[in-house]
Amino acid sequence: MSSAFRTVWWEAGQVCLIDQRLLPNETRIVRCAAVEDVAYAIRTMQIRGAPAIGCAAAYGMALAACSAAHDAVGDVARIYARLAEAKALLDAQRPTAVNLSWATRRVLERAQSLNDPSPHDVAQRVLEEAHAILAEDLAMCHAIGRHGVALIPPRGHVLTHCNAGGLATAGYGTALAPVRTAHEQGRPIHVYVDETRPFLQGARLTAWELIQERIPLTLITDNMAGYFMKRGDIDCVIVGADRIVANGDVANKIGTYSLAVLARAHRIPFYVAAPSSTIDCSLPNGDAIPIEERSSDEVTMLFGRRIAPEGVIAAHPAFDVTPADLVTAIITECGVIYPPFAGALQRSGPKRH
């Protein structure tokens, strides 16, 4: 990821993040002073991408802990209660992305592991854990790049969907990590970027990131993918994930399932890149994944202007589920996992309680 920007960070007791709704035309920093501000940023997609919102939520827990420690005056039970409230608030904002609840659970459990702490001790431990989650995510993304680069053929043409780059993570990205690694190694590579309606994460964010890195790209509308596959222009598809369940089913941005079907029809490898924090083996298959439904206005409006007739109600599931049998391999920081996925995912995923 270019050193010119960070996705989310802690500064002077606040959570800072780039407002991704405004890119690429404006780079605005949002400063969150309370956990409610972080929840709002996640819900309104000022910050998005499963790993990134996990990092932001961890820092949101730190804001809640610091505020409660200031008010608690020795009452540790009060700070734990405030952390539980903060976790419930944050978890409710984007239910499909499991990194969110994983991060808040990890922070809360770490705080509860302290022996006879003061409120200050709890707040300090929560902030340290949030810093650790951010650093670990960045390291995992680099590892995904190292493992995944071997899957891209020489002079490879890669199709990606939505944004699974540095803006979706602590930095460097998941689906874009192998692409970045190939580019850093001096290997010629070209990326086909789905614009990704209705929020245009591909056109606005992925294209912007690739331009920062001077990686060649072609922007296409979502309904052009089959055309370029049939022409032989695509060597492989690499996407990110918001949740990978026990059998290998993958929840990701709406439209991912369609790409997987097209890739199978054209015998093109379909890879999913995600850190282990995205693996959720508590769910047996994709039918159990909660799918977030977002506002109809995000489909019928574009940049504040209506693009559909007044009164039209649009469906807007934010994610779909790609069955495991359409996935060629899953790239994690631990290595490349091939079917059958179940056993390897159990070993690779984080422990959840």
Swiss-Prot record:
Its EC number is 5.3.1.23. It comes from the Bacteria. The active site is at D242 (proton donor). The record marks C162 as: Transition state stabilizer. One of its GO terms (biological process) is L-methionine salvage from methylthioadenosine. Pathway: Amino-acid biosynthesis; L-methionine biosynthesis via salvage pathway; L-methionine from S-methyl-5-thio-alpha-D-ribose 1-phosphate: step 1/6. Substrate binds at R48, G49, A50, R94, Q201, N252, K253. Keywords: Amino-acid biosynthesis, Isomerase, Methionine biosynthesis. HAMAP family: Salvage_MtnA. Catalyzes the interconversion of methylthioribose-1-phosphate (MTR-1-P) into methylthioribulose-1-phosphate (MTRu-1-P). Belongs to the eIF-2B alpha/beta/delta subunits family. MtnA subfamily. This is Methylthioribose-1-phosphate isomerase. It comes from Roseiflexus sp. (strain RS-1). The gene is mtnA.
